[in-house]
């Protein structure tokens, strides 16, 4: 039974959000880490993201049943109680907000609340089934954890926080569009109006390339603005990011298999954001 409730939290999404949070926190810390604040904020983000994922699963349980990828989720097949999950999400939300309010700062708590509301209330409940632009809204909520990490240290929403928000928003778009192409039939079965369905795969590929270019520019701006200072950051992130762009451009080949290509794009998007978070975390060490 515990395993089923764990599945309802979407562990993969929770883990990726924690990883980006760590990147933002260590970037702002610049080698001077307050381990108590780090641990408490990490737990706060863990509880908030968990709450968001559980609520998302509750709201999406009907469309999850129509999609091959999600049809066996616990809430979709009714193997766990909706009421219990609601209570679970509420408790996680309260604990997360309490930790952030009492041990970090009001800005960090506010960002977490905004991220939760945007993800659950605006993206999942209002826009996901109605608009192709829901992906943009979802990207905002997905970009909040690294900003929380940064602001937990800085206690201000400055240029660094804005750049992190832009970087992770821009990354989410090609990542999500790759999934959309890869799972196109699932989204069609669930009648979700994603870009590849409404505008076509070719247009979606154009968007992917544009967003990756913008992502590359903002990751470089993070260095130009002095928030990262090591040459290792520039070398590693640019190598991986330009390779990601190269893979994106391969999608225009006449003999391209869109399913295989989108799978490669999805996998490489994870490599790109993981390497970015890692290099942000290690930048202060490399800069010594």
Swiss-Prot record:
Its main location: membrane. Its EC number is 2.5.1.141. One of its GO terms (biological process) is heme O biosynthetic process. It is an enzyme of class 2 (transferase). One of its GO terms (cellular component) is plasma membrane. It catalyses: heme b + (2E,6E)-farnesyl diphosphate + H2O = Fe(II)-heme o + diphosphate. Belongs to the UbiA prenyltransferase family. Protoheme IX farnesyltransferase subfamily. PANTHER family: PROTOHEME IX FARNESYLTRANSFERASE, MITOCHONDRIAL (PTHR43448:SF2). Converts heme B (protoheme IX) to heme O by substitution of the vinyl group on carbon 2 of heme B porphyrin ring with a hydroxyethyl farnesyl side group. Carbon 2 of the heme B porphyrin ring is defined according to the Fischer nomenclature. This is Protoheme IX farnesyltransferase. It comes from Baumannia cicadellinicola subsp. Homalodisca coagulata.
């Amino acid at each position: 039974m515990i395993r089923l409730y764990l599945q309802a939290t979407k562990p993969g999404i929770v883990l990726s959000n924690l990883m980006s949070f760590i990147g933002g926190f260590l970037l702002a810390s610049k080698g001077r880490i307050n381990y108590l604040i780090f641990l408490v904020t990490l737990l706060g983000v863990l509880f908030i993201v968990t709450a968001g994922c559980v609520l998302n699963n509750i709201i999406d349980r009907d469309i999850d049943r129509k999609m091959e990828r999600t049809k066996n989720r616990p809430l979709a097949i009714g193997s766990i109680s909706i009421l219990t999950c609601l209570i679970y999400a509420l408790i996680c939300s309260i604990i997360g907000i309490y930790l952030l309010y009492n041990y970090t700062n009001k800005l960090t708590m506010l960002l977490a609340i905004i991220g939760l509301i945007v993800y659950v209330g605006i993206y999942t409940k209002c826009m996901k089934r109605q608009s192709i632009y829901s992906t943009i809204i979802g990207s905002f909520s997905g970009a909040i954890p690294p900003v929380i990490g940064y602001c937990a240290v800085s206690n201000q929403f400055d240029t660094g926080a804005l750049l992190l928000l832009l970087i992770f928003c821009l990354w989410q778009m090609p990542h999500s569009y790759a999934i959309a192409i890869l799972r196109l039939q699932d989204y069609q079965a669930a009648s979700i109006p994603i870009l590849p369905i409404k505008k076509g795969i070719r247009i979606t590929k154009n968007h992917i390339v544009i967003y990756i270019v913008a992502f590359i520019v903002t990751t470089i701006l993070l260095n130009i603005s002095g928030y990262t200072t090591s040459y290792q950051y520039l070398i590693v992130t640019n190598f991986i990011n330009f390779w990601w762009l190269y893979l994106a451009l391969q999608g225009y080949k006449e003999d391209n298999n869109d399913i295989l290509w989108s799978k490669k794009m999805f996998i490489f998007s994870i490599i790109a954001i993981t390497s970015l978070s890692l290099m942000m975390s290690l930048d202060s060490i490399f800069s010594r």
